[in-house]
């Protein structure tokens, strides 16, 4: 089976926080799992860099938008690499492949008769001599009264807005009052695909219920044509006849990045023909890891665009959406510096600590909240005391009593039964991962470690070592095999720690099933060191405040 795994493209006007990291980590865990199972996977994402927020920021800084996004793209690429995200292609919307693909794609949709032209009234700034789309306008939200709402969305109540909805609108650049002027734009005829979308959603058993319910509700209410163009300068030029000076709306071009990123991946490999093999084959499944606020773009707009192209692109197999991640019970806020940003997290602890906790508390069915108290508890109790302690006890015993050598012995009945149960837990991990129940899969991994601790305690090899060596040898061999299997599954969630454990087991390369599940392919235990350490929340909070006061990372200097 071929798989396309994708995470939502982060908008790179700022460093992502832990809420964004949840989706990225989730997609990475799933991609790593599929590779472990021998599936053919292309894992993609990229930097979303067009649109008004970046254009406005560049104007304020007196630099070109591309100069700003070059810097941010490089920084965010480094952050994802530092977190162990195993993208096959992390690209950007400024890539030549993406820009060419988007223009060609929309020209095909236009020629198929699914895009039309309409004259509309838009806000215009006479002083700056420009139309004011999206965030080029600020004003009072008509729903909640927030006085600094943007022309595309209110940051307080979350309602999506049009610039003309705002009360007392003002130009974001110069602060002057805009006027209404007529301008021409192009629209995607989304309502035309209502029935095809309804059928696709109703018949897709792999879409989560919350995504199905929301999407079908929107279809029932009646879909509206979607604006395709903007009067921005910073974006992909619209390809339609008479559309000179217009760009493709950032949301409507970035969503096509899932397709263009796969095309770019195979072009880089010199295998251009494989792009269609992946995207236009009935044997390919595509899965998208997103937040619940992005559901409509992935269950309605993106599938409708793929249908409209007439090119036979595979529709989304599943949309793995999550609820919101909060910080100590409240929404993340850059302006109020509430939350933890990715570069700050890396300054506090190694990436695997965050990978572990973000998946452990992944908001799969309801909103979840990061709390320092729970973070401390789960890292210390589950990661350090359960997994780390198991590894230390077994390997220390092998190093001291067996000089690092793994005994070659026939396993007794109890030890064989123990490993059978370990394999059963392994299958539970795999089943949960395939169902994208990542929290349950990680909890099963912890249960495997608990079972190992119980087995080692009950067997007491330190007593048998002198009096019943055969039983002690059987205990140690079974425990060593457990650690190999544990490392194999850990590599999906915490790759750096798993590779560290694999090396301590005296094994080469990275954890693989052929060696992990073998009773004979064993190494020599050496170079022991703690796999994890305990943390103290007070120390981490103090260190975080220090990072911000000193401006040690980019996100701290942005605020």
UniProtKB/Swiss-Prot annotation:
Source organism, top-level taxon: Archaea
Residues where Zn(2+) binds: 141, 144, 154, 157
Biological process annotations from GO: methionyl-tRNA aminoacylation
Swiss-Prot/TrEMBL catalytic activity: tRNA(Met) + L-methionine + ATP = L-methionyl-tRNA(Met) + AMP + diphosphate
Residues binding ATP: 334
Co-factor(s): Zn(2+)
CDD domains registered for this protein in UniProt: Anticodon_Ia_Met, MetRS_core
Predominant subcellular localization, coarse grouping: cytoplasm
Keyword Nucleotide-binding assigned: yes
Cellular location(s): Cytoplasm
Enzyme Commission number(s): 6.1.1.10
Short motif 'HIGH' region, span: 10-20
Cofactor details (free text): Binds 1 zinc ion per subunit.
Biological role stated in the UniProt entry: Is required not only for elongation of protein synthesis but also for the initiation of all mRNA translation through initiator tRNA(fMet) aminoacylation.
Family matches, as HAMAP family: Met_tRNA_synth_type1
Name under which the protein is recorded: Methionine--tRNA ligase
Organism per entry: Korarchaeum cryptofilum (strain OPF8)
């Amino acid at each position: 089976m071929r798989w396309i795994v994708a995470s939502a493209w982060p908008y790179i006007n700022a460093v992502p926080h832990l809420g964004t990291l949840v989706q990225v980590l989730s997609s990475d865990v799933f991609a790593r799992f599929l590779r472990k199972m021998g599936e053919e996977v292309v894992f993609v994402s990229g930097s979303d860099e067009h649109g008004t927020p970046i254009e406005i920021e560049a104007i304020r800084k007196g630099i070109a938008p591309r100069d700003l996004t070059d810097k941010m793209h490089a920084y965010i690429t480094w952050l994802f690499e530092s977190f162990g995200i195993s993208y096959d292609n992390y690209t950007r919307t400024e890539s030549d492949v993406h820009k060419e693909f988007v223009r060609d794609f929309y020209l095909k949709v236009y020629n198929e008769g699914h895009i039309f032209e309409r004259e509309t009234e838009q806000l215009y700034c006479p002083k700056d001599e420009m139309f004011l789309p999206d965030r080029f306008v600020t004003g009072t939200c008509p729903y909640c009264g927030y006085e600094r709402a943007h022309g595309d969305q209110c940051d307080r109540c979350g309602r999506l807005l049009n610039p003309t909805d705002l009360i007392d609108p003002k130009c974001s650049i110069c602060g002057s009052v805009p006027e209404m002027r007529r301008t021409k734009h192009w629209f995607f005829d989304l309502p035309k695909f209502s029935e095809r979308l309804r059928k696709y959603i109703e018949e897709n058993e792999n879409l989560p219920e919350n995504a199905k319910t929301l999407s079908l509700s929107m279809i029932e209410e009646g879909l509206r044509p979607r604006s395709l163009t903007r009067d921005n300068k910073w974006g992909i030029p619209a390809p339609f006849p008479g559309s000179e000076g217009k760009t493709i709306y950032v949301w409507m071009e970035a969503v096509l990045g899932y397709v263009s990123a796969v095309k770019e991946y195979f072009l880089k490999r010199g295998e251009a023909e494989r792009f269609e093999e992946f995207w236009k084959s009935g044997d390919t499944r595509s899965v998208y890891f997103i937040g619940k606020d992005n559901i409509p773009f992935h269950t309605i707009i993106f599938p409708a665009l793929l249908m409209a192209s007439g090119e036979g692109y595979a529709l989304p197999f599943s949309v793995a959406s999550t609820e919101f991640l909060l910080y100590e019970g409240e929404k993340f806020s850059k302006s109020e510096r509430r939350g933890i940003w990715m570069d700050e997290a890396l300054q506090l602890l190694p990436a695997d600590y965050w990978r572990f906790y973000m998946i452990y508390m992944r908001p799969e069915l309801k909103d979840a909240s990061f709390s320092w108290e729970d973070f401390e508890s789960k890292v210390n109790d589950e990661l350090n005391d359960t997994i780390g302690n198991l590894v230390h006890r077994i390997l220390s015993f092998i190093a001291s009593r067996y000089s690092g050598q793994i005994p070659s012995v026939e396993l007794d009945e109890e030890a064989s039964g123990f490993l059978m149960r370990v394999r059963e837990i392994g299958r539970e991990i795999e089943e949960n991962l395939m169902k994208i129940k990542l929290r349950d899969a990680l909890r099963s991994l912890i249960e495997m470690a608990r079972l190992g601790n119980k087995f080692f305690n009950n067997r007491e090899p330190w007593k048998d070592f002198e009096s019943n060596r055969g039983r002690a040898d059987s205990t140690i061999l079974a425990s060593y095999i457990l650690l190999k299997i544990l490392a194999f599954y850990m590599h999906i969630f915490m790759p750096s720690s798993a590779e560290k454990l694999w090396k301590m087991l005296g094994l080469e390369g990275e954890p693989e099933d052929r060696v992990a599940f073998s009773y004979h392919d064993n190494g020599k235990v050496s170079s022991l060191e703690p796999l994890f350490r305990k943390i103290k929340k007070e120390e981490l909070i103090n260190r975080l405040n220090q990072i911000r006061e000193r401006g040690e990372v980019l996100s701290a200097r942005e605020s």
